[in-house]
Every structure is written in C-alpha cells, then in structure tokens.
Amino acid sequence: RRQRQMCIRDSLYTVHDAEEAVKRIVTCEYGTTLQIADGVKVRFVDAGHLLGSASVEMWLTEGDDTRKVVFSGDIGNRDQPIIRDPQYIRDADYVLTESTYGDRLHDMDKDPDYTADLAAIIDETLGNGGNVIIPSFAVGRTQELLYFIREMKEQGLVKSVPGFSVVVDSPLAGEATRIFSGDLHGYLDEEAIAAPVSYTHLRAHETRSNL
C-alpha cells in the first residue's frame, strides 16, 4: 500500500496483543473432553491435515436440552505420508466446516506413485545439468516432499546424481522441518516415524546469502 501511495491502515492487532494472547493458551491432548464454561464441553480430534490440526466437538447444554456442534477447518485424506489419518466424527446436530473441495469427490481407489513420478523429473533434470526448484507451503507440504525425496534416495531412483543435495531455503520451512524431526509419537504415522524427514545431504538456510 505504501508503494502504491494508498492509505495505510492501522493493524487490528498489535504484537503486544499477540503476546498477551499466547499467555492464555491452554494445551490439551486429542480425545480429552474439557468443560470450558457452564453448559459447554469441547473435545479436539485429529483432523489429519497439518501437524496439530484438529476438529472440535462441542456439547452445548441449556436446561435439559443438549446439542452437539462440530467445527473444523481442512480435513486430511487417508493414507497420506507423515500425518496420521483423520479421526472421523460420526454424529452432530450442526456442522460448520471449511469447504474448499466441498463439491469434489476424491477417488480413494487410486494410489498415485508420487515418489516415482517426482524421481523421474529430478533424475532427468539433474542428468541434464539443471536444478529442480519446487515452490511449496512451508508447513506440511515441504515435509511431505522431503519424505518422498528420502524414499527415492533410499530406493536409488535418481541414478544421474544419486547423492544430490536438498536445500530448504525458507526459515519457516526449516524450523517446521526441525519440529517434524523431533519426538512426535502420537502425532505422526508409524511410517513417518521410521523414516523421518531429516537425512544426509539435507540443508536448511535462514538467508539467501547462505545458499
């Protein structure tokens, strides 16, 4: 807005507001039912979308009447790498949910081989002396890519340059990858724990000058 000489609007929230909000955060485990107010109970279940993502079950009681409301952002698919499958909620009186793909049906019978497809592209590009640049969301997608790249390295699918280096040049993606590489039993699926996203020839850089 400043470059376009447009009116600069004041932020709705300040850094101080954010710091004060963080002090009020209370953590809880998936599947734990909490009484957060009179007549209000909540329970978080794994949404299988991003690390720590959750759908929320709410039981609202007024007098003798109890209604169940479910709220959720994105819900993940089954059999995805790293993140556990979503826990499905079977009943509710009202549901509020993110619906980017609400008018599509995912074909769960197809089992695309992402590792082989990506390996073929990387193998051809490196064999021709090039580099592969993959734009990716810092949290979730980057770690999935690193997981697939680890698989192709272990299976020897990139024959032109078997020991090729992998560089993550986003500070946020690098920090997220370090979190994914920690002790996350109960949050990652067993395959991801057995084959983490951190491996030889993987580098994360905070600034461009380090590339």
PLM regions with names:
Residues 20-84, 209:
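Core dinuclear metal-dependent hydrolase active-site scaffold
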